[in-house]
């Protein structure tokens, strides 16, 4: 089994609904996601992994860095915490397998309430990661291209689709 197949299997064994391995060329980057964050997200200026935070790189600064990776494991779950926990576990495993620059990202589900909501610093800075849109990835266009499910929700009761990514050097 190849090392990347190991991570695919790991994602599924950790509860992911889907996991696919792609290249950075399969990821759709679009700096307009920054506008969607700025004018569409209730966490703008508050969330600890928000691109509005001082020092957070802009999407157009991050794209060239992310394109240096050789592959990207996309993890899909209907439960945000499962997607994030799987991406963390795979990031850790890949690191110990020798992929020192491995990097995961997902919408944050670490704390029940983000410390940023209270104007405090992140309680889990070693685990907190940026979301797709905060680094300039059009998650809708990307997952559509990969034939994975995602559509805007009309009602809060509709089933959600959450995505995480693990950027790999293998």
Each PLM stretch: what is its role?
Residues 2-170:
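Auxiliary alpha/beta "docking" domains used to position bulky ligands
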């Amino acid at each position: 089994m190849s090392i990347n197949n190991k991570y695919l299997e790991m994602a599924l064994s950790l509860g992911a609904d889907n996991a696919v391995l792609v290249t950075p060329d399969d990821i759709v980057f679009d700096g307009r996601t920054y506008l969607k964050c700025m004018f569409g997200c209730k966490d703008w200026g508050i969330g600890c992994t928000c691109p509005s935070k001082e020092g957070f790189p802009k999407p157009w600064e991050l794209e060239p860095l992310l394109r240096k990776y050789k592959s990207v494991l996309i993890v899909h779950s209907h439960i945000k915490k499962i997607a994030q926990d799987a991406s963390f576990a795979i990031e850790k495993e890949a690191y110990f397998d020798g992929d020192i620059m491995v990097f995961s990202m997902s919408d944050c589900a670490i704390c029940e309430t983000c410390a940023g909501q209270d104007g405090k610093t992140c309680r889990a800075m070693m685990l907190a990661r940026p979301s797709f849109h905060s680094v300039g990835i059009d998650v809708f266009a990307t997952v559509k291209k990969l034939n994975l499910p995602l559509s805007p929700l009309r009602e809060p009761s509709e089933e959600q689709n959450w995505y995480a990514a693990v950027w790999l050097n293998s």
